[in-house]
UniProtKB/Swiss-Prot annotation:
Domain Ricin B-type lectin, first and last residues per copy: 410-531
Gene3D superfamilies, sorted: 2.80.10.50, Aldolase class I (3.20.20.70), Golgi alpha-mannosidase II (2.60.40.1180)
Natural source organism: Aspergillus fumigatus (strain ATCC MYA-4609 / CBS 101355 / FGSC A1100 / Af293)
Enzyme class: hydrolase
Record gene name: aglA
Protein name: Probable alpha-galactosidase A
Length: 532
């Protein structure tokens, strides 16, 4: 059965140049998407009834009103064969009324509709991939009423003597060139980076991350979140994707969003505290809030997590910044970022298995001591005023999130946090004297750095001193000379403005290479990022 031929002729006429996707046109997806996807909960067990029941439940539970306005179909929705004209066909058993009918029904209820395809010759589930049919598939999806495309990366093999990374780039670039010609470009979710997220060597991963923001609006960057029937620890799976996301903050900006995968609030392997933590962390990252759960069966506690207005407001903040690590201890992470209107966000995670009590000085938040900061707990709404520090008690795997209002006289924020090697996870450490090195992060102020607008890095342990370049990296009294200025690039390198050498774990400083693991670093949110 040819399910698309009659619809395609109407679309060809509107495939005209109008706008670009990605960072060149941030208005296409100005804030992270919110909605539902079937994969982590149901995998290939999807059908028309599931999506109708899900949409109905999203309306009755208030999720649509809260902002969850997307319903996305993942793999296995299609027939195993293309039609006679090579167009894609839906599985008529799973979708007896057809995808166009389903899309119209969902849109009439207030939802946007997304769909899944693959850059290879087959999808991950063995269904027809888009390779060689990209323009036709884009036309098909638009004709069906689809406005969001998740493009996976299974079964991609190099062509024309290209490397594997070059092949992925060519295919995703080709899709981008097609989508940007559309009158209404589809939101483009790229899965390419996930196929290069090898912790043994991150260089190829970063090569891919360098180009995905130019082609699409968001990218699935690493491992899949644990599916409902999967083996292993769901919490460990969340922490793996959380860690990967902390390595990529420099890429996120208006028009491009890092995607650490789905929210899984009904996973049986998670405690309620862990479900709250995943939501709080994803919101702090301004990550997509795409729920993969049985929506009609969510408990009142799970729904309360997903409908938290304050955390949704953080996630949807128009600045689009990603929270970054102000401090990392053996068990506790402290993350911060700025919000629209000048507020600061403070997020504190207890990764450990026991109760943790942590004191967070205002300096760790990039603020100055002695000012009356109004702090609101975004879980319970409690408000307090602090001038020096906040003391937080956290249960195992719990996360607290605070919104901090700054008085006008104390509105200056200095980007502050750890400088860590993204491959090893080790922190740049002021070792006293003039020595500087990389050590396991331990939550010490010798590992927390202030980064000025001019590129001076000062350890909180002695802010009169600066990271200094020369024959080796050192910490010396700040003289604000050029050898104490550092430029942070989108590739993750930290280059000394005087020597033009790069900070390097293991040797301290060396000739700048191309995204070498030893030279790629995470810095605090708010630091100026150079193109390269």
């Amino acid at each position: 059965m040819d399910t698309t031929k009659s619809l395609l002729s109407t679309l060809i006429a509107i495939m005209i140049p109008l706008s670009l996707g990605s960072v060149s046109s941030p208005n296409l997806l100005p804030t992270p998407p919110m909605g539902f996807n079937n994969w982590a909960r149901f995998m290939c067990d999807l059908n028309e009834t599931l999506f109708l029941e899900t949409a109905s439940a999203m309306i009755s539970t208030g999720l649509l009103e809260a902002g969850y306005n997307r319903v996305n179909l993942d793999d296995c929705w299609m027939a195993y064969d293309r039609a006679a004209d090579s167009s894609l066909q839906w599985n008529t058993t799973k979708f007896p009324h057809g995808i166009p009918w389903l899309a119209r029904h969902l849109k009439a209820q207030g939802f946007h509709v997304g769909i899944y395809e693959d850059a290879g010759n087959l999808t991950c589930g063995g269904y027809p991939g888009s390779f060689g049919h990209e323009a036709l598939d884009a036309q098909t999806f638009a004709a069906w009423g689809i406005d969001y495309l998740k493009l996976d990366g299974c079964n991609v093999f190099p062509e024309h003597s290209r490397t594997l990374e070059e092949e992925y780039k060519a295919r995703y670039a080709h899709w981008h060139s097609i989508l940007k010609q559309m009158h209404h470009p589809l939101i483009f979710s790229e899965s390419a980076p996930a196929y290069f997220a090898d912790p043994a060597n991150l260089t190829s991963w970063y090569e891919v991350m360098d180009w995905v923001p130019a082609f699409g609006e968001l990218a699935r960057h690493s491992t899949d979140i644990l599916v409902y029937v999967g083996e292993g620890s769901a919490w460990d799976s969340i922490m793996v994707n959380y860690r990967y996301n902390t390595l990529l903050a420099r890429y996120q900006r208006p028009g491009y969003i890092n995607d650490p995968d789905f929210l899984i609030p009904d996973h049986p392997g998670l405690t309620l505290e862990e479900k709250r933590s995943q939501f709080a962390l994803w919101a702090s990252f301004s990550a997509p809030l795409i729920v993969s759960a049985y929506i009609p069966g969510l408990s009142s506690e799970e729904l309360a997590i997903l409908r938290n207005e304050e955390l949704i407001r953080v996630d949807q903040d128009v600045l689009g910044l990603q929270a970054t690590l102000a401090s990392r201890g053996l068990e506790v992470d402290v993350l911060t970022r700025s919000l629209e209107g000048g507020d600061r966000l403070l997020t504190v995670l207890n990764r450990g298995d026991g109760v943790a009590v942590v004191s967070v000085p205002v300096e760790w938040m990039g603020l100055q001591r002695g000012c009356p900061y109004v702090v609101k707990n975004l879980w319970d709404g409690e408000v307090q005023v602090l001038e020096e520090e906040i003391v937080i008690r956290l249960n195992s795997h719990a996360t607290q999130v605070y919104r901090i209002a700054l008085p006008d006289e104390c509105s200056t924020v200095i980007p502050t946090g750890i400088v860590f090697n993204t491959a090893s996870g080790n922190c740049l450490t002021d070792e006293n004297g003039e020595r500087v090195g990389f050590e396991a992060c331990r939550g010490s102020e010798t590992q927390i750095w202030q980064v000025s607008e001019l590129g001076y890095l000062r350890p909180l342990s002695r802010t009169s001193h600066c990271l200094t370049g020369g024959s080796q990296a050192s910490v010396q009294l700040c003289t604000e000379q050029k050898n104490q200025q550092w430029a942070y690039a989108i590739t993750g390198i930290l280059k000394n403005e005087h020597t033009e050498m790069c900070l390097t774990e293991g040797t301290g400083i060396s000739q700048c290479g191309f995204e070498r693991d030893s030279q790629v670093f995470g810095l605090p949110s708010g630091v100026d990022i150079k193109p390269s």
